[in-house]
Regions:
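Conserved beta-strand scaffold positions in the cores of enzyme catalytic domains, especially
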Residues: 22, 76, 146-148
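A structural signal for short, well-ordered beta-strand segments and their strand-loop junctions
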Residues: 51, 116-119, 147-150, 216
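Conserved nucleotide-sugar donor-binding
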Residues: 211-225
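Conserved core of the sugar-phosphate nucleotidyltransferase
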Residues: 126-215
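Conserved catalytic-core motifs of eukaryotic protein kinase domains, centered on the activation segment
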Residues: 18-19
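Conserved N-terminal catalytic core of the sugar/cofactor nucleotidyltransferase
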Residues: 1-7, 13, 27-117, 124-125, ...
Length: 227
C-alpha cells in the first residue's frame, strides 16, 4: 500500500493575509505545493489529502485540486474553529486557527494507511520525500511507529532575517526525545545563535537537527491522539 501525503493548508490565508501561497513562482506558474506534490509522487506516495478552510474552498479547488484529481486520488478535509472534541466549546472571541495536531485530526476519516504530514508553504526537497516514503512503506501493517525528517540547522537559516525552528534532541538510537521551539535564530558574529524571551543570546551547533514539520505516522495515531 502506498503512503498518503497530508498537506496542511488551512492556515494559509491567516499567515499571509490572503492566499499568496497559491501564487506561482516556477517558470510555468508552479507553487511550492506543486513542487512538493511532484517530489512526493516520484518518491512513491499514492494519495493526497489537503486540509483547508471552507472560506477558500472554491479558489483552492480551482488552482490546486483541478491539477491533480484526474491523475491521483485526492481528498479535501476542513479545519474549522468549531470542530472540537467532545466536551470542548469554542470561545466566542476565538479567531486564531487551532494548532497542527487539530489540523492533522481532521483527516482521521479519510486516511487509513501510513501517511506523511507537511506544511503547504515549505519546500522540503526530493530526497526528504524519498527517505520518508521508504520509511512509511516499511511501517505498513505496524502500529505505534512515528517518525520525523530532521534537517541540519545551518541549512535552514534565512538571509532575510531570523527564523523559528524546533530544535530536536535524539537519543543514542536516533529516537526523538525532545523538541524545543526557538523563535529567533540567526547567524550572529559568525555563529548560529538564538535569542530567548529575556533577550539573551545562546549558541546552537551548526549540525543541530531541527524540525521543519515533516512527519510520518501509522494511522493508529488518530486513535491515540483522540484519547
Amino acid at each position: 500500500m502506498k503512503p498518503t501525503l497530508y498537506v496542511l493548508a488551512a492556515g494559509m490565508g491567516s499567515r499571509y493575509g490572503g492566499l499568496k501561497q497559491l501564487d506561482g513562482l516556477g517558470p510555468n506558474g508552479e507553487t511550492i505545493m506543486d513542487y512538493s506534490i511532484y517530489d512526493a509522487l516520484r518518491a512513491g506516495f499514492g494519495k493526497i489529502v489537503f486540509v483547508i478552510r471552507k472560506t477558500f474552498d472554491k479558489e483552492f479547488r480551482e488552482k490546486i485540486i483541478s491539477k491533480y484529481e484526474k491523475h491521483i486520488p485526492v481528498e479535501v478535509v476542513y479545519q474549522e474553529l468549531d470542530n472540537l472534541p467532545k466536551g470542548f466549546t469554542l470561545h466566542p472571541d476565538r479567531q486564531k486557527p487551532w494548532g497542527t495536531n487539530h489540523a492533522v485530526m481532521m483527516a482521521k476519516e479519510v486516511i487509513h494507511e501510513p501517511f506523511a504530514v507537511i506544511n503547504a508553504d515549505d519546500f522540503y526537497g526530493r530526497e526528504s520525500y524519498e527517505i520518508l516514503a521508504k520509511q512509511l512503506i516499511a511501517m505498513t501493517g505496524t502500529e505505534n511507529h512515528y517518525c520525523m525528517v530532521g534537517y541540519r540547522l545551518s541549512n535552514t537559516l534565512s538571509e532575510s532575517g531570523a527564523v523559528a525552528r524546533g530544535v530536536c534532541e535524539t537519543d543514542d538510537n536516533h529516537f526523538l526525545s525532545s523538541i524545543v521551539e526557538r523563535t529567533h535564530i540567526e547567524r550572529k558574529d559568525g555563529v548560529i545563535q538564538y535569542k530567548d524571551a529575556e533577550n539573551y543570546w545562546f549558541e546552537l551547533p551548526e549540525n543541530a537537527p531541527v524540525s521543519m514539520n515533516m512527519w510520518g505516522f501509522t494511522p493508529d495515531y488518530f486513535e491515540h491522539s483522540d484519547k
